[in-house]
């Protein structure tokens, strides 16, 4: 009787009989490696450190919240491990044969890529919660207390420091990594200021406040490309500035912008409520996509897709339309930025498992 009723209803036009389309296949899981042991009674853990991958050897290096840096080869075999005394809250930087990472214990560490042996460490005396940059023989890093430090890339010897007094009261945890372009090192600060400094000396070329007045004025996203600097201020604005002068090129007012990515002729902006695709040269909004879950690490724009870390998982978005294609959900969400090497993508889950995905 039930079957006859279903057939009769299907014959009446207006009743759908087709199943929903199968999810779009974007990747296969090549391997999974647990890196962080489960902690008892830990509620909703978050792994902010994330992976970096060497484009030559394929070695992937991951910093985790329990103070370890782990290195694995392309097949997921453990290569080496290094222990610090504080958490790693941003992906490391691989430069030539060296891994450089900042820790909440206040140190910058330089390790040999092949062995994990400590080459040098620098005591910044403040939490280093951003990915270091390497340029002009210098390692540059922002601390979480609003200092931009520069040290010799070979020895770790101090070269210069630029500091602004942190804004009083609470600020958003984390911050923007140093951007380097055009002979300048650009830092972002919790008082809403962006400062462009001469790379070799730390001399201020220009400073500009980009954050509207508000409770949280942190500048949490920076990207530089093509003579332009893009900045995201949490209190409600995305700016494009002339890299050499700081002059405003365009501004977009939107609540809660906190992370940026550039790629494929698109500026991807992640806010607390949505993801926005913007034309970098004119500031025209091409698309918006509502965001569920909390944003965290920096998005990555690669080719026709953008990958956005989120407490719901790693969101895969069509860069041309803003359509959500798939979500890679390891069960605990993804707070760290992914790392790409060719068709291979490395993702660290909030449970501390490292996944290797092969994009199809």
Model region roles, listed by residue range:
Residues 1-6:
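Sec-dependent signal peptide recognition
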Residues 14, 22-53, 79-95, 118-136, ...:
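Extracytoplasmic beta-rich repeat domains
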Residues 67, 105-107, 146, 192, ...:
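Short coil/turn segments within WD40 beta-propeller repeats
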Residues 70, 109, 149, 195, ...:
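WD40 beta-propeller blade core
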Residues 73-77, 112-115, 152-156, 198-202, ...:
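Short loop/turn segments that connect beta-strands within beta-propeller blades
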């Amino acid at each position: 009787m039930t079957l006859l009723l279903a057939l009769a209803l299907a014959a009446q036009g207006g009743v759908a009989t087709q199943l929903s389309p199968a999810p779009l296949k974007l990747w296969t899981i090549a391997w999974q490696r647990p890196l962080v042991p489960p902690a008892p009674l830990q509620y909703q853990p978050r792994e902010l450190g994330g992976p970096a991958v060497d484009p030559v050897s394929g070695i992937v290096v991951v910093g985790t919240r329990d103070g370890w840096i782990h290195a694995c080869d392309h097949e997921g075999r453990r290569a080496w491990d290094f222990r610090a005394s504080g958490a790693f809250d941003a992906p490391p930087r691989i430069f030539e044969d060296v891994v450089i990472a900042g820790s909440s214990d206040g140190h910058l560490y330089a390790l040999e890529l092949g062995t994990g042996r400590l080459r040098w460490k620098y005591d910044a005396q403040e939490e280093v919660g951003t990915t270091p940059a390497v340029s002009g023989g210098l390692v540059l890093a922002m601390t979480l207390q609003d200092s931009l430090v520069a040290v010799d890339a070979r020895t770790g010897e101090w070269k210069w420091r630029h500091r602004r007094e942190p804004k009083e009261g609470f600020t958003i945890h984390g911050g923007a990594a140093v951007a380097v372009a055009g002979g300048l090192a650009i830092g972002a600060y919790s008082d809403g200021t962006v400062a462009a400094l001469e790379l070799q000396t730390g001399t201020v070329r220009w400073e500009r406040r980009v954050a509207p007045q508000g409770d949280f004025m942190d500048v949490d996203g920076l990207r530089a490309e093509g003579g332009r600097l893009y900045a995201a201020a949490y209190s409600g604005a995305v700016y494009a500035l002339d890299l050499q002068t700081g002059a405003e090129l365009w501004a977009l007012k939107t609540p809660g912008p906190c992370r940026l990515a550039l790629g494929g002729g698109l500026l991807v902006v992640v806010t607390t409520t949505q993801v926005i695709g913007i034309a970098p040269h004119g500031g025209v909004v091409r698309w918006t996509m509502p965001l569920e879950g909390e944003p965290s690490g920096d998005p990555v724009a690669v080719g026709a897709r953008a990958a956005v870390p989120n407490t719901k998982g790693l969101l895969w978005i069509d860069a041309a339309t803003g359509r959500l294609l798939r979500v890679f959900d390891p069960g605990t969400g993804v707070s760290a930025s992914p790392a790409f090497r060719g068709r291979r993508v490395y993702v660290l889950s909030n449970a501390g498992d490292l996944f290797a995905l092969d994009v199809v």
